[in-house]
């Protein structure tokens, strides 16, 4: 997304308070615990600590807890939201990042309790209020899920 040849400085780490300043999500739907690195207009690396105390593990699945794929994608989307809001200087403005499309999603390995899920998201392009991203979730160096999605930056719906 960067339109100049200037070197953009990395931001990070960012704690959960800074994440919450960029996102409207709260427990139990806040799925980004911290940001390790954010390069405005380019990429973000964030972390979701997946614990057995996650509410979704109660029913998904009893005796064999696995993080639902849709929530892995949601965690990636939230990381993208932080990237977009921080990159555009919109933190604290109340602007929201809404999903518009999810494409090319693949789930490679299950996400179980007790791991740190690494969320890597890159800007592919931005035009006006529309942003496209490429993302992947990793467990150590193994890809658990990958996807591309489109989102829109807008004011909250009333």
Curated annotation (Swiss-Prot):
Transmembrane segments: none
SUPFAM superfamilies documented for this protein: Thioesterase/thiol ester dehydrase-isomerase (SSF54637)
Pfam family, one: FabA
EC number: 4.2.1.59
InterPro entries attached to this UniProt entry: FabA_FabZ (IPR013114), FabZ (IPR010084), HotDog_dom_sf (IPR029069)
One GO term of the biological process aspect: fatty acid biosynthetic process
GO cellular component entries: cytoplasm; membrane
Residues at the active site: 60
Keywords (A to Z) from UniProt: Cytoplasm, Lipid A biosynthesis, Lipid biosynthesis, Lipid metabolism, Lyase
Any one GO molecular function term: (3R)-hydroxyacyl-[acyl-carrier-protein] dehydratase activity
Recorded catalytic activity of this chain's protein: a (3R)-hydroxyacyl-[ACP] = a (2E)-enoyl-[ACP] + H2O
Entry's localization field: Cytoplasm
Record-stated family: Belongs to the thioester dehydratase family. FabZ subfamily.
Biological role stated in the UniProt entry: Involved in unsaturated fatty acids biosynthesis. Catalyzes the dehydration of short chain beta-hydroxyacyl-ACPs and long chain saturated and unsaturated beta-hydroxyacyl-ACPs.
Protein name (database record): 3-hydroxyacyl-[acyl-carrier-protein] dehydratase FabZ
Native species: Zymomonas mobilis subsp. mobilis (strain ATCC 31821 / ZM4 / CP4)
Higher taxonomy: Bacteria, Pseudomonadati, Pseudomonadota, Alphaproteobacteria, Sphingomonadales
């Amino acid at each position: 997304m960067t339109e100049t040849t200037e070197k953009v400085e990395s931001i990070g780490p960012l704690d959960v308070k800074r994440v919450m300043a960029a996102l409207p999500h709260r427990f139990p739907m806040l799925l980004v615990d911290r940001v390790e690195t954010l390069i405005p207009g380019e990429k973000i690396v964030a972390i979701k600590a997946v614990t057995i105390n996650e509410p979704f593990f109660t029913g998904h699945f009893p005796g064999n807890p696995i993080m639902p794929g849709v929530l892995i994608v949601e965690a990636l989307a939230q990381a993208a939201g932080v990237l977009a809001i921080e990159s555009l200087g919109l933190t604290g403005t109340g602007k929201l990042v809404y999903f518009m499309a999810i494409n090319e999603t693949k789930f490679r390995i299950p996400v179980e309790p007790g791991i740190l899920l690494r969320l890597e998201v890159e800007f592919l392009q931005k035009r006006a209020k529309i942003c496209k991203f490429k993302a992947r979730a990793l467990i150590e160096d193994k890809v658990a899920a990958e996807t591309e999605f489109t989102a829109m930056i807008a004011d909250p719906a009333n």
